[in-house]
Amino acid sequence: LTQNTRGSYPIESIENRTSNSMAGNPKNVVFLTCDAFGVLPPLSRLTPEQAAYHFISGYTAKVAGTEIGITEPQATFSTCFGAPFMPRHPSIYANLLSDKIRDNDAKCWLINTGWVAGGYGESSRIKIKWTRALLNAALKGDLDDVVFVKDRRFGFSVPTTCEGVPDNILQPRETWNDKKKFDNVADLLARMFIENFEQYKEGVSDEVMSSSPIVLGSQ
């Protein structure tokens, strides 16, 4: 019917439903983004403060099929990944989220399903099988004993290995032939984060503000 059809059905149609409409506290919280610049890792681990920052930022890309008239990816920031439905200051929702993550000792992940080895028009999207392998590993705890490295520009932690995923895919800079171009594009995205967050800094804690990316220049 459309490029991105939605459907609904009665809850009674689900055989293993629960009648009280409640579940336990999650052990993992996953944010989904689509980075058309090709600079974000396919999987990153976030601290509660970083989770609040990225939740407020709501960075992703509009891609064909999600909105009428979109034929190629467009970078966008949608507060709390759903700006029209958040009437109060974003920090209220972000603080609630980070408190829940902290109180329940949950892990928070940022999964990127965008482009790798270059940006849109220069490369291809991350393979679905890699995204599945990373998500399954995160949810099963298979990454608990894996070495993580801190991304110098964005600050989050990135695994160095994951079964079923080439190691270089986990470090986006390693997939680009032109490392200087990668640095320039990554700095461009970092600036976009910083400029977008200016409108929210009043009322946001110093800890959350410190999760902002930094502009590094060529490394």
Q: What is each stretch, according to the model?
A:
Residues 1-175, 192-195:
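Glycine-rich, often acidic-flanked micro-motifs
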Residues 169, 174-219:
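Generic C-terminus detector
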